[in-house]
């Protein structure tokens, strides 16, 4: 597996967004989604067969958009129990591969063109099954020459050089991953994945918003933007007043109550999982874990979440929670650092695997 001059890539393949960084000195972020023009008119308008990035939102009415990891199903859950047909699973596989390829091209503008192999470390949920990991590796075939699939929270800890006595909570759109770090790569059984995340908060917020303001017209993108700007879980001192259309007219609405209730829906499952995981270790190590909790992922930006977690552990002896300094790139930068330090036996060769072909019909 050794090569004198590969390009290394670290990738946080998120449910909603994918962040990526490379040893070539580039980093970027893109939606984990692919759009196909709905018909020949849309194809002529867009001038291409596949759409990525900001154009997915701008032209969403003209596109069949696929988010392959929506609600974490194919990254964490059982594809057979997902309700997806075989054709839909194949379409999601293709969408995943196209996202990976697009993201890698963003940060390796001269990678393959210069004849250099590309080695990548990809982060997945803590308790992703072998089937889930294989899905990601199969999707990476034809993009990377070699790959390593690792726990997402571990990449955060590795990037911060917090490799001992640390508990990482990575709150993504589809899952919350909790991982203890104590000087070695953690075993799967020692980690926890909670099958909800930012998507569940968006869903709950939209439901409560429509119940309180039945005349309001909102999209899921609008709901997500409000949450990302105003989301909070602390007791007092926050207010969220936003303009929302009613019969086409922007009208101020106080969404504080439904927003807080939706965000709080994330707290109890996370706190319960953290308490349960910490209790598995001996008392001395429990204290060290509680006093060195790292909060990462997009959900870490909810105002007051760090304090709420600390308060929830007060009766267990207290805790110290620190947010990552850059929630967008912490996982990708850590994965890149891990890739650059990976021993040859840590890589799985992918060269020679077939690339995906475009399906005849795209399942919505």
Please give the residue ranges for each predicted region:
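The start of beta-strands in P-loop NTPase/AAA+ ATPase cores
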Residues: 7, 118, 147, 164-167, ...
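Residue-level signature of catalytic and energy-coupling elements of molecular machines
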Residues: 18, 34, 100, 140, ...
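Phosphate/pyrophosphate-binding loops at sites that engage ATP/ADP/AMP, CoA/4′-phosphopantetheine
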Residues: 103-118, 213-219, 274-292
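Helical "lid/coupling" subdomains associated with nucleotide-phosphate turnover
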Residues: 87-99, 148, 155-159, 202, ...
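Phosphate-binding glycine-rich/basic clefts of nucleotide- and phosphate-handling proteins
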Residues: 37-57, 182-267
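Gly/Thr-rich phosphate-binding beta-strand-loop-beta motif of the actin/hexokinase/Hsp70
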Residues: 1-29, 160-188, 205, 234-238, ...
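Conserved phosphate-binding loops in N-terminal lobes of ATP-dependent enzymes
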Residues: 9, 15-121, 270
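Active-site neighborhood for divalent-cation/phosphate handling
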Residues: 91-162, 183, 198
């Amino acid at each position: 597996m050794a090569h004198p001059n590969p390009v290394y890539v670290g990738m946080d393949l998120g449910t909603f967004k994918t962040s990526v960084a490379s040893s070539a000195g580039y980093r970027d972020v893109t939606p984990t989604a692919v759009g196909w023009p709905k018909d020949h008119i849309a194809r002529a308008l867009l001038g291409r067969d596949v759409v990525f990035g900001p154009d997915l939102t701008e032209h969403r009415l003209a596109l069949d958009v696929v988010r392959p990891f929506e609600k974490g199903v194919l990254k964490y859950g059982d594809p057979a129990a997902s309700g997806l047909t075989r054709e839909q699973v194949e379409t999601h596989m293709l969408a995943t591969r196209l996202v990976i390829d697009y993201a890698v091209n963003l940060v390796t503008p001269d990678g393959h063109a210069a004849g250099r192999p590309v080695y990548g470390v990809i982060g997945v949920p803590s308790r992703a099954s072998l089937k889930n990991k294989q899905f990601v590796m199969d999707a990476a075939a034809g993009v990377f020459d070699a790959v390593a699939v690792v726990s997402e929270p571990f990449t955060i800890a590795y990037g911060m050089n917090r490799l001992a006595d640390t508990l990482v909570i990575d709150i993504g759109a589809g899952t919350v991953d909790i991982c203890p770090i104590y000087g070695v790569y953690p075993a799967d059984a020692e980690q926890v994945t909670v099958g909800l995340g930012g998507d569940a908060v968006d869903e709950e917020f939209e439901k409560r918003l429509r119940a309180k303001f039945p005349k309001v017209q909102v999209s899921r993108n609008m709901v997500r933007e409000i949450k990302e700007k105003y989301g909070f879980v602390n007791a007092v001192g926050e207010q969220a007043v936003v303009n929302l259309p009613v019969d086409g007219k922007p009208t101020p609405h106080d969404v504080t109550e439904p927003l807080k209730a939706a965000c709080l829906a994330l707290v109890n499952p996370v706190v319960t999982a953290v308490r349960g995981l910490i209790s598995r270790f001996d008392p001395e190590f429990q204290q060290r874990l509680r006093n060195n909790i790292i909060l990462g992922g997009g959900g870490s930006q909810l105002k007051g979440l760090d304090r709420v977690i600390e308060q929830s552990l007060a009766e267990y002896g207290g805790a110290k929670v620190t947010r990552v300094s850059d929630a967008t790139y912490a996982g990708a930068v850590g994965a890149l650092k891990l890739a650059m330090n990976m021993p040859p036996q840590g890589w799985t060769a992918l060269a020679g695997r077939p690339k995906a072909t475009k399906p005849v019909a795209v399942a919505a």
